[in-house]
């Protein structure tokens, strides 16, 4: 059966470790894996604009010996004049894998149903699993482990980053806290899934409206923009609602003294995070951004290897 990566929990805890171990290896020896030599082509499709996702996937695919085919919104008929399943059947005849940054998660699921090559979710409205892999790689670099650590997310608990922090964090054995106001809490489906995983890994889940409760003793502090793509018309309302959830010096005072700060970027200083935090010594956001490259290379290498094993 073809392996895909649409959600963080598409990797078991042991598989997540395999990918993160490989990511560390590829960071040390950038060109040691060449699974796309030929070169084979990987389509990288964007329905949403991107900087880090395009940079990291295009560079990573080239590092792996492949050819990145960048398809921007409006440059193809994906999802327009034929079913995604039909498009997928054509794509699998020419490509080694498909990477898609899109809106509705259901589109990814439909694409998967029609293809026998790996599909990677480069971001959907539901989750952002490639980012969380990079986050976990960064945590391992700075803390030496993930299991038993507390990771606290502040802000829009219904966002894709909050959902992926939940799923990816508990898969890694972390205690995950989400601090969010009423009306912006995580989708109950993701909370239930995360709790089920945590019961097996020793992690835990806490959803709270109290940012102080989430910050207390935390090892990893995470936030994201308050105004995601597609939410621009809610900007004023969101800034007012999330004001108490800004990450600032007070947040760090409550956290563990050795806590690190993560943000997937772009960041808006003075809104979700203060300049004191993101530009300070506890911020690891630039390492985190670089690790998108290494984590995604490891993921693609792992998926291609698994699918070749299954084909034998």
Swiss-Prot record:
Binding of carbamoyl phosphate occurs at 50-53, 77, 101, 128-131, 264-265, 292
Q: Which reaction does it catalyse?
A: carbamoyl phosphate + L-ornithine = L-citrulline + phosphate + H(+)
Binding of L-ornithine: at which residues?
Answer: 160, 224, 228-229
The keyword Ligase belongs to this UniProt entry's keyword annotation: no
Q: What is its EC number?
A: 2.1.3.3
In terms of InterPro entries, this protein maps to: Asp/Orn_carbamoyltranf_P-bd, Asp/Orn_carbamoylTrfase, Asp/Orn_carbamoylTrfase_sf, Asp_carbamoyltransf_Asp/Orn-bd, Orn/put_carbamltrans, OTCase_ArgI
The entry's keywords: Amino-acid biosynthesis, Arginine biosynthesis, Cytoplasm, Transferase
Protein location: Cytoplasm
Q: Which GO terms describe its molecular function?
A: amino acid binding; ornithine carbamoyltransferase activity
Q: What is its main location?
A: cytoplasm
Record SUPFAM superfamilies: Aspartate/ornithine carbamoyltransferase
What PROSITE patterns would the database entry show? Answer: CARBAMOYLTRANSFERASE
Q: Please give the GO cellular component terms listed in this UniProt entry.
A: cytoplasm
Associated pathway: Amino-acid biosynthesis; L-arginine biosynthesis; L-arginine from L-ornithine and carbamoyl phosphate: step 1/3
Q: Name one GO biological process term.
A: citrulline biosynthetic process
Q: What's the family?
A: Belongs to the aspartate/ornithine carbamoyltransferase superfamily. OTCase family.
Role this protein plays? Reversibly catalyzes the transfer of the carbamoyl group from carbamoyl phosphate (CP) to the N(epsilon) atom of ornithine (ORN) to produce L-citrulline.
Q: What is this protein called?
A: Ornithine carbamoyltransferase
Q: Which organism is it from?
A: Leifsonia xyli subsp. xyli (strain CTCB07)
State the taxonomy lineage: Bacteria, Bacillati, Actinomycetota, Actinomycetes, Micrococcales
């Amino acid at each position: 059966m073809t392996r895909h990566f649409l959600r963080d929990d598409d990797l078991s805890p042991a598989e997540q470790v395999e990918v993160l171990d490989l990511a560390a290896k590829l960071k040390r020896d950038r060109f040691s894996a060449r699974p796309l030599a030929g070169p084979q082509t990987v389509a990288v499709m964007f329905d949403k604009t991107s900087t880090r996702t395009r940079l990291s996937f295009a560079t990573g695919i080239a590092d792996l010996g492949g050819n990145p085919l960048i398809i921007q919104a409006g440059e193809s008929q994906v999802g327009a004049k034929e079913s995604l399943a039909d498009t997928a059947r054509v794509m699998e005849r020419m490509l080694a894998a498909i990477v898609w940054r899109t809106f509705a998660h259901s589109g990814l699921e439909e694409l998967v149903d029609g293809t026998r090559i790996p599909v990677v979710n480069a971001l959907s409205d539901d989750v952002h699993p490639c980012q969380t892999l990079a986050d976990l790689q960064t945590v391992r670099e700075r803390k030496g482990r993930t299991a038993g650590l507390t990771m606290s997310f502040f802000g829009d608990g219904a966002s894709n980053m909050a959902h992926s922090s939940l799923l990816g964090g508990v898969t890694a054995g972390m205690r995950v806290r989400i601090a969010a106001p009423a009306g912006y809490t995580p989708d109950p489906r993701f909370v239930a899934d995360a709790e089920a995983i945590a019961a097996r890994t020793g992690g835990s889940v806490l959803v709270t409206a109290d940012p102080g409760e989430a910050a207390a003793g935390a090892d990893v502090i995470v936030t994201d923009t308050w105004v995601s793509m597609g939410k621009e018309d809610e900007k004023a309302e969101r800034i007012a609602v999330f004001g108490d959830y800004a990450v600032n010096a007070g947040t760090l005072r409550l956290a563990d003294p050795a806590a690190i700060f993560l943000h997937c970027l772009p960041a808006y200083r003075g809104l979700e995070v203060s300049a004191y935090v993101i530009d300070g010594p506890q911020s690891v956001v630039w390492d985190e951004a670089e690790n998108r490259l290494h984590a995604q290379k490891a993921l693609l290498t792992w998926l291609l290897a698994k699918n070749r094993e299954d084909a034998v």
